[in-house]
From Swiss-Prot:
EC number: 4.2.1.104
Organism name: Prochlorococcus marinus subsp. pastoris (strain CCMP1986 / NIES-2087 / MED4)
Protein name, entry field: Cyanate hydratase
Its job: Catalyzes the reaction of cyanate with bicarbonate to produce ammonia and carbon dioxide.
Taxonomic lineage: Bacteria, Bacillati, Cyanobacteriota, Cyanophyceae, Synechococcales
Active site: R88, E91, S114
Keywords tagged on the record: Lyase
Length: 147
């Protein structure tokens, strides 16, 4: 997958400034995953957020428009992912997608989980047998309309 030039520029500046997504999130009062999604062109910053990030990363102010314009979302390559970490999420959906769907629909009825009214958190859970990744997704349930 080829990354957009804006993504490359933001990631390079973040690395040069030795900042984490958490650092940048704290600066603008946003979650680290949201900031990462902004860097990858999947979120829209307010003008104030864009200005703060540009200043922290020592970038030019002309990037404010790029960061605050709604992007085309979900534009990853339409093939099975090859990055090992991203592939595991694909694999998780292959194995657990239908079971998750059934459990969600047993609890909520016929509908979907919003990816718009949505948040995601990633945490590290220390474990003597090997650290664990905890991913929490929270999306509004949207029932299908009957007519």
């Amino acid at each position: 997958m080829t990354l957009p030039s804006l993504t490359k520029l933001l990631l390079k500046a973040k690395k040069e400034k030795n900042l984490s997504f958490e650092d940048l999130g704290n600066l603008i009062n946003r979650d680290e995953v949201w900031v990462a999604s902004l860097f990858y062109g999947q979120a829209t910053a307010s003008e104030e957020e864009a200005t703060s990030l540009i200043a922290a990363l020592d970038l030019t102010s002309d990037l404010k428009e790029d960061l605050s314009t709604p992007p085309v979302k979900g534009c990853l390559d339409p093939v099975i992912p090859t990055d090992p970490l991203i592939y595991r999420f694909y694999e998780i959906m292959q194995v657990y997608g239908l079971p998750m769907k059934d459990v969600i629909q047993e609890k909520f009825g016929d509908g979907i989980m919003s990816a718009i009214d949505f948040s995601i958190e990633v945490d590290k859970v220390e474990d003597p047998k090997g650290d664990r990744v905890l991913v929490k997704m929270c999306g509004k349930f949207l029932p299908y309309k009957k007519w």
